[in-house]
């Protein structure tokens, strides 16, 4: 059985995945509270805040991967 490859990007990804678990839990909890009292503006604001924080975190993860992809592509291009 082959051993899965592990490298720097895997470590970076794992750190993002660990952080996003907590944020996902917070978003879910805020949504559950909002669903119980949909007319409460404080709960709506809390949900929007948590969702925005989650989106920012995921965007950072996506941008990090894209930067490394671009760097790798530039390195490969320089060898041609």
Curated annotation (Swiss-Prot):
UniProt effect for mutating residue 75 to A: Shows a specific deficiency in the secretion of the translocase SipB/SctE. Shows fully assembled needle complexes, but has a reduced number of needle filaments. Is able to invade cultured epithelial cells
Effect of residue 78 to A: Exhibits constitutive secretion of substrates. Retains the ability to display SipD/SctA at the tip of the needle filament
Known outcome of mutating residue 8 to A: Decreases invasiveness. Abrogates host cell invasion and effector secretion
Keyword Secreted attached: yes
Annotated phenotype, changing residue 79 to A: Abrogates host cell invasion and effector secretion
GO CC annotation: cell surface; extracellular region; type III protein secretion system complex
Compartments reported by the entry: Secreted; Cell surface
Protein name: SPI-1 type 3 secretion system needle filament protein
Stated consequence of mutating residue 3 to A: Can only secrete early substrates such as InvJ/ScpT, PrgJ/SctI and PrgI/SctF. Can polymerize into filaments in vitro and in vivo, but the stability of the filaments is compromised
Result after altering residue 53 to A: Exhibits constitutive secretion of substrates. Retains the ability to display SipD/SctA at the tip of the needle filament. Does not yield assembled filaments in vitro
Similarity field: Belongs to the SctF family.
Residues annotated as transmembrane: none
Induction statement: Negatively regulated by PhoP-PhoQ.
Knockout or disruption consequences: The null mutant strain is non-invasive.
GO process terms (BP): protein secretion by the type III secretion system
Phenotype for residue 50 to L: Has wild-type invasiveness
InterPro entries hit by this protein: T3SS_needle-like, T3SS_needle-like_sf, T3SS_needle_YscF
Subunit structure: The core secretion machinery of the T3SS is composed of approximately 20 different proteins, including cytoplasmic components, a base, an export apparatus and a needle. This subunit polymerizes and forms the helical needle filament. Interacts with the needle tip protein SipD/SctA. Interacts with the needle adapter protein PrgJ/SctI, the secretin InvG/SctC and the minor export apparatus protein SpaP/SctR. In vitro, the needle protomer refolds spontaneously to extend the needle from the distal end.
Entry domain remark: Deletion of the last five residues prevents self-association and yields monomeric proteins that allow biophysical studies. Forms a right-handed helical assembly with roughly 11 subunits per two turns. The location of the negatively charged surfaces are radically different among the needle filament proteins PrgI, BsaL and MxiH. In PrgI, the major negatively charged surface is not on the 'face' but instead is on the 'side' of the two-helix bundle, and only residues from helix alpha1 contribute to this negative region.
Phenotype for residue 20 to A: Can secrete effector proteins. Exhibits constitutive secretion of substrates. Retains the ability to display SipD/SctA at the tip of the needle filament
Annotated effect of mutating residue 16 to A: Can only secrete early substrates such as InvJ/ScpT, PrgJ/SctI and PrgI/SctF. Can polymerize into filaments in vitro, but not in vivo. Cannot enter cultured epithelial cells
């Amino acid at each position: 059985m082959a051993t899965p490859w592990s490298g720097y990007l895997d470590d970076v990804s794992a750190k993002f995945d660990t952080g996003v678990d907590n944020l996902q839990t917070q978003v879910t909890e805020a949504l559950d509270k909002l669903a119980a009292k949909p007319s409460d503006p404080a709960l709506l604001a809390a949900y929007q805040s948590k969702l925005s924080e989650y989106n920012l975190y995921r965007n950072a993860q996506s941008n990090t991967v894209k930067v490394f992809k671009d760097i790798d592509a530039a390195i490969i291009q320089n060898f041609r």
